[in-house]
Design a protein with these regions (language model features):
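C-terminal peripheral helix-coil segments that are non-catalytic and often amphipathic
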Residues: 115-173
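Alpha-helical bundle regulatory/interaction domains
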Residues: 8, 33-36, 41, 118, ...
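An amphipathic alpha-helix adjacent to DNA-recognition modules
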Residues: 1-21, 34-38
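Secondary-structure edge/capping motif, primarily at the C-terminal ends of alpha-helices
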Residues: 20-24, 51-58, 86-90, 117-124
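Amphipathic alpha-helical packing segments from all-alpha helical-bundle domains
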Residues: 63-89, 100-115, 133-148
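Short, hydrophobic secondary-structure boundary micro-motifs
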Residues: 52-55, 67, 95, 158-159
Length: 173
């Protein structure tokens, strides 16, 4: 069973690496940032069993835990660097420490969003699968963490894009 879990986790990591451009010289614009959030949630949807049962999987398979932690730390470092680049360009207002804290909070929400949504479902509902609305709301939550740090037109555009991820009835409340 461990071989199967580790093979699936490797596919998950490969999919995330492709989305995040790990090891590639991607430009680091605001558009890259929201697209990164969106595509990361698509990968999470494809491999939701990992996120939904993360604590249990990591407890049962210590090698998985080690690899997940390394991947998480790498992601936080890359996002923190992305935020510092945006800050240097004047698009984002954050110190190095705030950029690191923002990256950590993004990782926290992204990693555990499915757990929260599953807990919020009524007992006995189709909690095994997370729908597109739940993932869209996760994208919105992450983008809402980033938006206050943005400046000027960049902030307003990011906010407009973020609102598109809200369910129809919630958009104008």
């Amino acid at each position: 069973k461990e071989d199967i879990v580790m093979a699936l986790f490797e596919r998950y990591q490969d999919a995330l690496a492709e989305v995040t451009g790990e090891g590639q010289g991607h430009t680091q614009s605001i558009d890259d940032l929201w697209l990164l959030v969106h595509l990361s949630f698509e990968v999470i949807q494809d491999y939701q069993f990992i996120h939904r049962d993360l604590s249990e999987l990591c407890a049962a398979f210590p090698p998985l835990r080690r690899r997940f932690v390394r991947g998480l730390e790498s992601g936080v470092s890359r996002l923190s660097a992305h935020c510092r680049t945006l800050a240097a360009a004047g698009s984002l207002d954050a110190t190095h420490e705030e950029a690191r804290a923002l990256a950590t909070n993004v990782a926290l929400v992204t990693t555990y969003w499915l757990n929260l949504r599953t807990l919020q479902r009524p007992t006995g509902s189709a909690a095994a699968m997370v729908d597109d609305d739940a993932l869209s709301q996760g994208v919105f939550q992450v983008m809402s963490l980033i938006t206050p740090y943005l400046r000027g037109e960049t902030q307003e555009e990011f906010r407009r894009v973020a609102r598109r991820y809200l369910p129809q009835g919630v958009r104008h409340c």
